[in-house]
């Protein structure tokens, strides 16, 4: 793939076909195993349970699982990334309907992050996080002949 990043892997998710996930709360580099093309991409794992699993499948009534997992991730210096489906949110009522959950749960998560972790987090776009990871976390490579640097 000619892509800079991917965000389709979960750290763990017992409700997915591969429940073990990638087993990390940190971004990582996936090298291209083929010759030619892009050198690889940065994987940004989802580390918070997706909304549809929590509220529609498990029937959770509060964002407490998100908040507890977020605190656990912060203690370890990891990436907090959640998959949210606006089409499952109920923006008009505060109760649960078939295949809908209150949008206030997402608001509560965002309020919690901005209050509890004020000035302690970075909220980049995925492409910005992937670029930072490539520049800051991958080992430096010697420049190829001609002086042009290539990504690892």
Describe these PLM feature segments.
Residues 63-152:
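C-terminal domain-boundary segment and adjacent tail
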Residues 1-78:
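Active-site-adjacent pocket scaffolds in enzyme catalytic domains
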């Amino acid at each position: 793939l000619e892509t800079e990043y991917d965000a389709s892997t979960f750290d763990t998710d017992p409700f997915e076909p591969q429940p073990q996930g990638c087993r990390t709360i940190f971004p990582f580099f996936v090298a291209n195993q083929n010759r030619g093309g892009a050198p690889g991409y940065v994987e940004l794992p989802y580390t918070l349970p997706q909304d549809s699993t929590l509220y529609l499948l498990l029937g959770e009534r509060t964002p407490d699982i998100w908040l507890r997992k977020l605190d656990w991730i912060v203690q370890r210096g990891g990436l907090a990334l959640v998959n949210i489906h606006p089409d499952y949110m109920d923006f008009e009522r505060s109760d649960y309907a078939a295949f809908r959950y209150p949008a206030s749960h997402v608001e509560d998560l965002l309020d919690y992050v901005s209050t509890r972790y004020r000035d302690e987090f970075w909220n980049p776009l995925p492409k910005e996080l992937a670029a930072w990871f490539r520049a800051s976390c991958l080992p430096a490579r010697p420049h190829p002949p001609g002086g042009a640097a290539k990504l690892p």
